[in-house]
Amino acid sequence: MARVVFVHGVGKQYLSEDSLARDIVPELRGGVRLARAEAAARDGAGADGAVAVPAPEDVAVAFYGDLFRPAGTRADDENFQAADVESDLEFELLMAWWAEAARTDPQVPAPDESGTRGKVGWAAAQGLRLKTVRRALDALTGAQFLEGVRDRVLIGNLKQVVRYLTDPDIRIRAQAAVAAHLTPDTRVVVAHSLGTVLAYEALCAAAARGEKVNVQMLVTLGSPLGMRGVVLNRLHPAPVDGRAVWPRNLRAWTNIADTTDIVAVVREIAPAFGPAVDDLVVHNGTHMHDATRYLTAIETGRAVAAGLAGTADE
């Protein structure tokens, strides 16, 4: 069985486990190769003294994107518009992304919440909110790091996050896709974006079921886990007194975020998950949330290598 399990993020509904693996596995192995070369040079031990790069068959992709694929023909494809941002949670998440984009990109205007509050009628309030959603989408699609991304893609990704957090059936089936790859051989779990939420919850669930899973390292990339109102407070299991539960089957955790990744609104998650989390910052260039950019970062390679070597907390 695979020693490394990768859990993908949003927007993969038209891919498959195999197509994702073609992109993910080489980049993950490349990141470890960088860390291996660094360790060999530092220790002067040569390549034989560093952790081996995992073989392709040692890396598995936990795929759940099909759960978000719309049924029917191409004509039924989801052509989302501003009016489709309907729930309060969707609106809250969109506003968080907008605020973070404005904080990290001087070209993005900051949100003005004054238009969404006050003593107005329901219809007027809905009209103001729709106008705010349109402004948010305009701001985000004009951001330096989201140039070329369409409204329907942003809204679709937004809805996938919210559906996972609010739809019990989606949550159960998505976690089952991850759990299917967690075995006594699993040493490292690498997760990206929404996949970090799945990975965390799947590890907690496996521990609760008493399964023989002992992961040396969890590597979370571009994670929204630290967003208290939207994500953290909706986790299973729920946080206790503001502190999230540490999975009993996990030895070490490295959390990595790009300095401008708007999805990782809270880049330091140690305050919520405990001081054992090692929060690191990287720079992914113009593709701040791209999974392959994260995987090729040497910081990611080091974390994966430490997990494979069994030196995760040394």
Give the positions of each predicted feature.
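Lipid deacylating catalytic domains
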Residues: 1-65, 69-76, 116-190, 194-314
